């Protein structure tokens, strides 16, 4: 909820959590908790605090064999006032779709782009997206889709906010 000037009234996050062997069960069976400012989740003597807020857009990719994959990843608010945010998602093809590991790696997808909770378009042809309000009044995305080696299985940690530019420069990822 937001005030008329765009200031958030309260920050909350509905989370599910598990510990011990419960992490191997279905997430629907995990404990639920509404995380709020100054009301941390307490687990095994630790406290998990809500540090900020933003959006995690949901994307679904349908592969040529009809299988689909859905991901929801937190995007980084680049504009703290109107929450224009950036992020990236990486998708591995469904198991069994490509028997050769090299071919499968070449068919990974990466989506990188912007999310605007209240999209506003400007520019000569209306092709520049920004956000004019922090609440989701007219959500929009501007994305680039890449195919190739998204680095999913190279053993290195990756940013959830941007692609490794070396993958595109080397030709491993192509728009």
Q: What is each of the regions a protein language model found here?
A:
Residues 1-175:
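Solvent-exposed, non-transmembrane regions of integral membrane proteins
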